[in-house]
């Protein structure tokens, strides 16, 4: 598929301190956060003018789903716009608390685990053709997804009975099976629940729930662009070596705990291979595929270059090669500098605080954003583009239709209902348009609906 629809959903961790002590429950904090949303949307599950969906997920986790994007950099921009939308809600909620005499600070974390060991996710969505055999897609993709954490993980300090250690992935500990239709109870690598949000005869939606939430724009870019390339190879029937793992769930944990990328995991055919070996295999195939099909674009070259440097950095233990571009490395360098300066062990509470503060989305407080201000991290988008994406949908996908419809309905104060595929005016005629093609950004039926308001 030369043109693909992408989407990212991020759940955010919420906490509130009251003069340093937690006072409000996550449920109460979530209510404060979403009060503004509920006042105009009459619900804590709304679609926005930029085509995105914002809602309160299970367990009081705010979740932001980007609009449909057909370009990876645009996707990164809209993912960041989600952070800004939530940061706006946070500032508004803090002001409300203050007005009510509650001296509280609200924190929103774009990470995947809280101190109690609960996990929440970052889900990637890739539109794939209905034509192929899904089981083959999963077979080829799972070894890639299990091992890619060594280049796209967000990093985490893990407390173990033997002391603290650094893991490359936050999410790996919480994945329990390879392919499944559940997302919460038994967390799989690929979720198969068949909701394409598109013409089900043509498409299905690949729902990858194994990834970490990334702060780094370049890491998100690599995560999505590399997966897209692997999908393209599968779709075009490129012959891949059988890298099926004997036990992918054990492998994902073992790989996460090994920052050298060298730990061998057992494959189903009895061979052993490391995360570096397996990723190198996919990278070599991808480079060859891009050259042979003449698919090269600046973005693909940037992704392949970072993929290669990421593997080289891990293999040679020369993390400086990617210490501005890969989340787990950026964070590790930050932690190591702080430890050296203050003479602290990895298990010290101040280091755990640092680990968490990296994911704070408040731009005046979060450590990732302090690094960004100093020019210490690489970027793929700009603050201006992110600001625009808070209110302007992608112009080349169905999100444009949804965004335009919502904008006009709100301006005209009309009652409406939307989801990913339906646009409905709640008037006497109950006019509804079904938009089954996510690639279609112009539709006369929608235009008539908008003009008729």
Swiss-Prot record:
EC number, UniProt record: 6.3.1.19
Transmembrane feature ranges: none
Pathway: Protein degradation; proteasomal Pup-dependent pathway; Protein modification; protein pupylation
Catalytic activity: ATP + [prokaryotic ubiquitin-like protein]-L-glutamate + [protein]-L-lysine = ADP + phosphate + N(6)-([prokaryotic ubiquitin-like protein]-gamma-L-glutamyl)-[protein]-L-lysine
InterPro entries in the cross-refs: Pup_ligase, Pup_ligase/deamidase
Protein family membership: Belongs to the Pup ligase/Pup deamidase family. Pup-conjugating enzyme subfamily.
HAMAP family named among the record's database cross-references: Pup_ligase
Protein name: Pup--protein ligase
């Amino acid at each position: 598929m030369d043109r693909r629809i992408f989407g990212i959903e991020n759940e955010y961790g919420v906490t509130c301190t009251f003069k340093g002590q937690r006072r409000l429950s996550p449920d109460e904090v979530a209510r404060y956060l979403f009060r503004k949303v509920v006042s105009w949307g009459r619900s804590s599950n709304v679609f926005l003018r930029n085509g995105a969906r914002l809602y309160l997920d299970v367990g009081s986790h705010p979740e932001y789903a980007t609009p449909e994007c057909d370009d990876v950099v645009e996707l990164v921009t809209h993912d960041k716009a989600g952070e800004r939308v939530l940061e706006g809600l946070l500032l508004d909620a803090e002001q409300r608390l203050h007005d009510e005499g509650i001296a509280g600070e609200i924190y929103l974390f774009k990470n995947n685990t809280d101190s109690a060991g609960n996990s929440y996710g970052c889900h990637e969505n890739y539109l794939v053709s209905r034509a192929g055999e899904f089981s083959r897609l999963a077979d080829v993709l799972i070894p890639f997804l299990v091992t890619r954490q060594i280049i796209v993980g967000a990093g985490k300090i893990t407390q173990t009975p033997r002391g603290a250690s650094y893991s490359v992935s936050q999410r790996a500990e919480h994945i329990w099976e390879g392919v499944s239709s559940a997302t919460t109870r038994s967390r799989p690598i690929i979720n198969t629940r068949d909701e394409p949000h598109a013409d089900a005869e043509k498409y299905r939606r690949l729902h990858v729930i194994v990834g970490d939430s990334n702060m780094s724009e370049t890491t998100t870019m690599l995560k999505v662009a590399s997966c897209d390339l692997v999908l393209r190879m599968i779709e075009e029937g490129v012959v891949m070596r059988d890298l099926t793992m004997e036990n992918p769930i054990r492998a994902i944990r073992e790989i996460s705990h090994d920052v050298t990328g060298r730990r061998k995991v057992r494959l189903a055919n009895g061979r052993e291979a490391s995360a570096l070996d397996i990723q190198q295999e996919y990278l070599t195939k991808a480079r060859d595929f891009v050259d042979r099909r003449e698919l090269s674009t600046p973005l693909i070259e940037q992704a392949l270059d970072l993929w290669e440097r990421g593997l080289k950095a891990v293999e040679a233990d020369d993390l400086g090669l990617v210490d501005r571009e890969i989340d787990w490395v950026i964070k590790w360098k930050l932690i190591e500098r702080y430890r050296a300066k203050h003479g602290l062990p990895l298990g010290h509470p101040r280091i755990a605080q640092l680990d968490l503060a990296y994911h704070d989305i408040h731009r005046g407080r979060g450590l990732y954003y302090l690094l960004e201000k100093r020019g210490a991290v690489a970027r793929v988008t700009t603050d201006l583009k992110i600001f625009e994406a808070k209110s302007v949908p992608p112009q080349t996908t169905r999100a444009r239709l949804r965004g335009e419809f919502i904008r006009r309905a709100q301006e005209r104060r009309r009652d409406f209902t939307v989801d990913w595929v339906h646009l409905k005016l709640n008037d006497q005629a109950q006019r509804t348009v079904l938009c089954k093609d996510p690639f279609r950004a112009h539709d006369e039926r929608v235009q008539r609906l908008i003009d008729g308001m």
